[in-house]
Amino acid sequence: MNNQSLLDGDYVRALDARLDSDEAYIEYQRAEARRALPFLARFFDVRNARVLEVGAGRGGKGIAYAQAGLRITSLDVDVDALGMGVNAARRAGVAMDFLAGDGARLPFSAEAFDAILLDSVIEHVADPFAVLQECYRVLTPGGVVFVVFPPFYGPLSGHIDDFILIPWFHLLPRHIVQRKLFSMERRLGFLTPHEAYAVFATLNRLTIFGFKRAARRAGFTFAYWRVRPFLTHPGMRLLVGLVSALRRPPRLENLRAVLVRARREFTVGTFLLFLLLSALAPLVFIPFAQEIAAGGVKVVLKKIG
């Protein structure tokens, strides 16, 4: 993905508004998919490819991919979320398939797809190996699986940071996390603390080491592998903005605009968190140490033969 797109006004607005409503979240998903498309195009022909999206949720990403020419089948266990996706696809005038199903028991014949998308999904399934094994079965030879997930021991990998922005808080005993969330009365758009806990409770504690082992056992080779830090959304925008502003020739007005935006977006707490995560960032290049520093892993798995 192009980090420069983090500064795109439409993307920033979609990101900031993503919890306002179901429709806003679908639009955010579409914006994320548009960012991902150039990367995906490096590994398979996105024109008319047969693509399965596992864990599609409300379907926004699949809609954007279908608009780009992919033949998308969106699958999820959440029937209500799929219903939102069906309605959104109809409003967008997009032809795509929605199907309720389990990633560990895919209802497709062998070699049915050219690519599979597991975007922020594999950390929630009961058996990651079973899902990867099924993906291998339904892929054509040479097909790829695009995977993104936050390793469980990363600083903000608990899916609760919309409410609790404390590094590694999710590693505390589950009843403490639950009590803290349930004590909060505020909600963020459609997201409540109880719903955030429900998402947290699905996490399978997937690690980088555990994912690699499961992928190899399923038969895949690695076509792309990257472990990255996550420095908070304001922090990522600050870094990308500074790099852009300081490129030759550096422009003082661009630098000033970046700093003004950062001052508006950061609180004292989030800026201190940004400094802590920045200090940890080099650890993502060190095996084993990366487990406690990573914000996310982006992988492309390939089926050979």
Regions found by a protein language model. Give the residues of each.
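A short beta-strand submotif of the Rossmann-like class I SAM-dependent methyltransferase core
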Residues: 118-121
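Helix-to-beta-strand junctions that scaffold the AdoMet/dcAdoMet cofactor pocket
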Residues: 125-126, 139-140
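A structural alpha-helix within SAM-dependent methyltransferase catalytic domains
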Residues: 63-66, 132-136
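Conserved N-terminal segment of class I S-adenosyl-L-methionine
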Residues: 1-105, 115, 292-304
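S-adenosyl-L-methionine-dependent methyltransferase catalytic module, highlighting the catalytic core
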Residues: 129-130, 134, 144-302
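A short, aliphatic-rich alpha-helical micro-motif
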Residues: 45-46, 110, 132
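Surface-exposed loop/turn positions
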Residues: 49, 110-112, 142-143
